[in-house]
């Protein structure tokens, strides 16, 4: 199955999602926001999540496959003041996604579309578990 990849996700978040309850996660990494920008929420919409950094993502890496329930992308405006004077104004894009655990998965192939394009992966859902 080919789906968008979210990388650099905290191992604690992945562990929490494995319990099975839907969770809302806020993303601030540009590459992750770009990767989910074209994803439409729904029961057939999946995302691969892993704690591995984008640059290190390779075939054989493990993570989880989640179902996308909702996506919200927003722009936040921030103003910093220093000693009562205007100091700096900037905007920051963030995305909130609500996801639910689907299955453990292993990367079969990675597709990178440049720095400003989404990262997608071909994954195999784990159907057999080994103790060890």
Regions found by a protein language model. Give the residues of each.
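Compositionally biased, charged N-terminal/linker segments
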Residues: 1-41
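Short, surface-exposed beta-edge/turn micro-motifs
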Residues: 1-2, 43-46, 94
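Generic structural signal for buried aliphatic residues
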Residues: 23, 45-47, 63
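Short coil-to-beta transition motif at edge beta-strands of beta-rich domains
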Residues: 34-58
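Hydrophobic beta-strand residues in large extracellular and virion-surface proteins
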Residues: 47-49, 66-68, 97-101
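Amphipathic alpha-helical interaction segments
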Residues: 54-55, 71, 75-79
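Short beta-strand-centered aromatic/proline hotspots
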Residues: 59-74
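Contiguous surface segments at macromolecular interaction interfaces
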Residues: 77-132
């Amino acid at each position: 199955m080919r789906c968008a990849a979210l990388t650099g996700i905290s191992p604690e978040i992945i562990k929490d999602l494995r319990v099975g309850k839907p969770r809302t996660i806020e993303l601030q990494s540009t590459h992750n926001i770009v990767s989910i920008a074209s994803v439409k929420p729904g029961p057939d919409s999946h995302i691969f999540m892993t704690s591995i950094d984008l640059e290190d993502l390779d075939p054989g890496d493990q993570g989880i496959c989640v179902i996308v329930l909702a996506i919200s992308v927003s722009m936040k405006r921030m103003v910093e003041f220093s000693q009562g004077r205007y100091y700096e104004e900037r905007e920051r894009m963030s995305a909130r996604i609500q996801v639910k655990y689907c299955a453990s998965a292993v990367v079969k192939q990675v597709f990178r579309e440049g720095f400003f394009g989404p990262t997608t992966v071909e994954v195999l859902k784990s159907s057999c578990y080994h103790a060890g």
